[in-house]
Curated annotation (Swiss-Prot):
Domain of life: Eukaryota
Broad EC category: hydrolase
Protein name: Tripeptidyl-peptidase 1
Enzyme Commission (EC) number: 3.4.14.9
Keywords of the record: Autocatalytic cleavage, Calcium, Disulfide bond, Glycoprotein, Hydrolase, Lysosome, Metal-binding, Protease, Serine protease, Signal, Zymogen
Protein localization: Lysosome
Gene giving rise to this polypeptide: tpp1
Catalytic activity entry: Release of an N-terminal tripeptide from a polypeptide, but also has endopeptidase activity
Binding residue positions for Ca(2+): 512-513, 538
Sugar attachment sites: 53, 205, 216, 280, 307, 438
Cofactor descriptive note: Binds 1 Ca(2+) ion per subunit.
């Protein structure tokens, strides 16, 4: 039997083509090499099949997201999205025949039929994907199977696939976008009394009555790798900080496997602050540690969303990676998945990152800024960060110097933001040199919130001075959930993909942040300074931070 499989496999090996030639296959320094994986060990690979009607879906998303369109808010069901995007019969047949020819039979798909997840031995995987060589790596208690060399597929299959998941991508070195910035920041900013739900609700003008009441409303956070929240931490947090407003102290639903280890500070932060800003609203937690050593947790989360007909309306995610560490094929395909979520009326919020404009060292003499993905996707709403100008009281906000922002090197600037971004580029006198950024790329963030010096309860311990855009993102997500709540009570649809409407509002309902810059490359040309805030939109804080009553009124039609 193995001989027959080999003969069939040999036929398919002729004239292979690289599928993700630009994918960074470098092993991050914090992962330890354990050696080659045995040929009979199993891997699970995810095959992203080419979809149909991508341009049509893009046009439909513009229509359902544009408040001036007669189709505004007329979202599609998952089945309707699946009917549009499903791969062609030829694509399905070619890919399935290719897999069967290698003896790969243990496969399952999802409702949209555009992803195939298949279990096979390493021996078969390496024959299927010439050039791949799987090794085992470890970090703390986590192990992964990955190939550090480029892979190809047969030329007849190449045109039918976007990428194969589970081959190259390591989890991001920082795990997710933000970290609890203790250490040096704690020593400098230790005098701050700290941001709590009461501070958030006061600053953004949320009253005790501004809580959820609609039965059909819901919101969610996503967690990856060893990031888990503990129910006891949430209950303790609400006991300490939830006075003065009606709230829930338990998560409605956990999707995935909730680990039994120590709570992660990021996971605690996400859950505690989406549930205190979007108070009294049903909250889900998507937890994706990866069931198999070869799985990619972020990709598994995307597949879950594509396979569930009923999901929360607002999702906040504090995850990101450098654009230049990912293949364009992968990013373009994930971008389409965000587009499909928008067609369903789902709001996807991503943290902008905690590295300012970032910095990539190209040569000894040349640096550029380093945009982050998915923050740079034109089909998500990206949230930046701010600090109080006066750390002792509720004062106006300035930029948080770590707040991520900039211009994509992969995605062109979408129509909805062209006027705002061009106005910024024309009006600001102290821009960084244009060799550092792409003036025609998707610019982010879109808006912001406080991201500095939060109180969090993790492992039953109250922890101060936690900072990052993983704090601001769930706060904005909760506020959008409150607006959805009011819309549902009036018979209006969910906000969905909010960016086209947000840019048409031109900052209405948002506090404009005009003071401060964020960090970037430490060289003699920019000297650590990236972009700076300015009146109207800017690539540090977007349009600004929420003024809830005005923001709500602006979004209630």
């Amino acid at each position: 039997m193995r001989v027959a499989v080999f003969v069939l496999s040999f036929i398919w090996l002729v004239n292979g083509e690289l599928l993700e030639a630009d994918q960074d296959a470098v092993v991050p320094g914090d992962w330890t090499f354990l050696g080659r994986v045995g040929p009979l060990e199993e891997v699970e690979l995810t095959f992203a099949l080419k979809q149909q009607n991508v341009s049509k879906m893009e046009e439909l998303l513009k229509l359902v997201s544009d408040p001036d369109s007669h189709q505004y808010g007329k979202y599609l069901s998952l089945d309707e999205v699946a009917a549009l995007s499903r791969p062609s019969p030829l694509t399905e047949k070619v890919v399935e025949n290719w897999l069967r020819s290698h003896g790969v039979m243990d496969c399952h798909t999802i409702i949209t039929r555009d992803f195939l997840q298949c279990v096979m031995t390493v021996e078969v995987a390496e024959a299927l994907l010439p050039g791949s060589k799987f090794h085992r790596f470890s970090k703390n208690t986590k192990t992964l199977l990955r190939s550090t060399s480029q892979y190809s597929v047969h030329e007849d299959v190449h045109q039918h696939l976007d990428f194969v998941g589970g081959v190259h991508r390591f989890p991001q070195k920082r795990k997710i976008v933000s970290k609890g910035w203790e250490g040096a920041r704690q020593a400098i900013l230790g005098y701050h009394l700290g941001v709590t739900p009461a501070v958030i609700r006061n600053r953004y003008n949320l009253t005790a009555k501004d809580v959820g009441t609609a039965a059909n409303n819901s919101q969610a956070v996503a967690q990856f790798l060893e990031q888990y929240y503990h129910p006891a931490d949430l209950a303790e947090f609400m006991s300490l900080f939830g006075g003065g407003f009606t709230h829930m102290s338990t998560v409605e639903r956990v999707v995935g496997t909730q680990g039994g280890g120590k709570a992660g500070i990021e996971a605690s932060l996400d859950v505690e602050y989406i549930m205190s800003s979007g108070a009294n609203i049903s909250t889900w937690v998507f937890t994706n540690p990866g069931r198999h050593e070869s799985q990619e947790p972020f990709l598994q989360w995307m597949l879950l969303l594509s396979n569930m007909s009923a999901v929360p309306w607002v999702h906040t995610i504090s995850y990101g990676d450098d654009e230049d560490s990912l293949s364009e094929a992968y990013m373009n395909r994930i971008n389409i998945e965000f587009m499909k979520a928008g067609l369903r009326g789902i709001s996807m919020l991503f943290a902008s990152g905690d590295s300012g404009a970032g910095c990539r060292h190209l040569t000894k003499e040349r640096n550029t800024f380093r945009p982050s993905f998915p923050a740079s996707s034109p089909y998500v709403t990206t949230v930046g960060g701010t600090s109080f100008q006066n750390p002792f009281k509720l004062s106006y906000e300035v930029t948080d110097y770590i707040s991520g922002g900039g211009f994509s090197n992969v995605f062109p600037m979408p129509d909805y933001q062209v006027d705002a971004v061009r106005a910024y580029l024309k009006s600001v006198q102290s821009l960084p040199p244009q060799t550092y950024f792409n003036t025609t790329g998707r610019a982010y963030p879109d808006l912001a919130a406080l991201s500095d010096n939060y109180w969090v309860v993790s492992n039953r311990v109250p922890i101060p001075w936690v900072s990052g855009t993983s704090a601001s993102t769930p706060v904005v997500g909760g506020i959008l959930s409150l607006i959805n709540d009011q819309r549902f009570l009036k018979g209006l649809p969910a906000l969905g993909f909010i960016n086209p409407r947000l840019y048409k509002m031109q900052g209405k309902g948002l506090y404009d942040v005009t003071v401060g810059c964020h960090l970037s490359c430490l060289d003699d040309k920019v000297e650590g300074k990236g972009f700076c805030a300015s009146p109207s939109w800017d690539p540090v804080t977007g349009w600004g931070t929420p003024n809830y009553p005005v923001f709500l009124a602006s979004l209630m039609d």
